[in-house]
């Protein structure tokens, strides 16, 4: 697998729940690893009356005060500035892509069809005998990746996900009975 930093950006979203149809997209973060350029943007509450995930992502209703909807001009600039039309967008799980797709659809924003996502969590195979310990944080600790934090900010998660992607080095992981096996590609 190609690990050239200039071929990727990392996307992380913070949300108000797990349903991209019922829960708000609270923030969007995009990290360009070769330049270390970072985009981090709060969005207003629309679908929910309050923020229910503050203990996970640290985002409060006060943080969102004055936040504005994403505009088509901002989307176009983001696609251009972060070269999203030519880079693969890395995500750790399918939630990020799903929330972006449904936000674009709800707001009538164009450009989602230009984006190419790769959910590298698909390279991690875990059995039902793993005891629920296969978290991004635990994998980062296993690979000695620093700066794992209790609060999951989009900006920090983007950097952690990039470091984890590099450490996996294109290998698939098999996790069973709390043991981790790297499988060669």
Mark where each language-model region is.
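Conserved non-catalytic scaffold segment of RNase H-like nuclease domains
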Residues: 2-112, 138-142, 146-152
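Acidic two-metal-ion nuclease catalytic site recognized across multiple nuclease folds
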Residues: 2-3, 142, 162-185
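Short, glycine/acidic-enriched loop or turn micro-motifs at the edges of active sites
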Residues: 15-17, 122, 160
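Non-catalytic alpha-helical scaffold/packing segments enriched in small hydrophobic residues
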Residues: 99-103, 119, 160
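Short alpha-helix plus adjacent loop in nuclease-associated cores
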Residues: 116-134
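Substrate-binding/catalytic groove segments of enzymes
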Residues: 131, 146-147, 171
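Hydrophobic faces of stable alpha-helices that mediate helix-helix packing
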Residues: 133-136, 140, 158
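Alpha-helical transmembrane segments that form the membrane-embedded catalytic/substrate-binding core
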Residues: 154-164
């Amino acid at each position: 697998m190609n690990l050239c930093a200039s071929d990727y950006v990392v996307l992380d979203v913070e949300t108000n729940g797990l349903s991209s149809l019922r829960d708000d997209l609270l923030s969007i973060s995009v990290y360009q690893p070769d330049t270390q350029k970072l985009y981090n943007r709060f969005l207003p509450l629309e679908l929910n009356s309050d923020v229910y995930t503050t203990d996970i992502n640290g985002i409060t209703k006060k943080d969102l005060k004055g936040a504005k909807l994403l505009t088509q001009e901002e989307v176009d600039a983001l696609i251009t500035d972060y070269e999203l039309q030519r880079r693969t967008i890395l995500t750790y799980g399918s939630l990020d892509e799903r929330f972006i797709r449904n936000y674009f659809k709800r707001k009538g924003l164009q450009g989602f069809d230009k984006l190419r996502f790769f959910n590298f969590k698909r390279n991690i195979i875990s059995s039902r005998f793993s005891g629920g310990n296969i978290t991004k944080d635990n994998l980062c600790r296993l690979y000695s990746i620093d700066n794992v934090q209790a609060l999951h900010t989009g900006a920090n998660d983007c950097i952690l996900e990039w470091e984890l992607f590099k450490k996996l080095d294109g290998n698939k992981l098999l996790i069973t009975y709390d043991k981790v096996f790297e499988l060669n590609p």
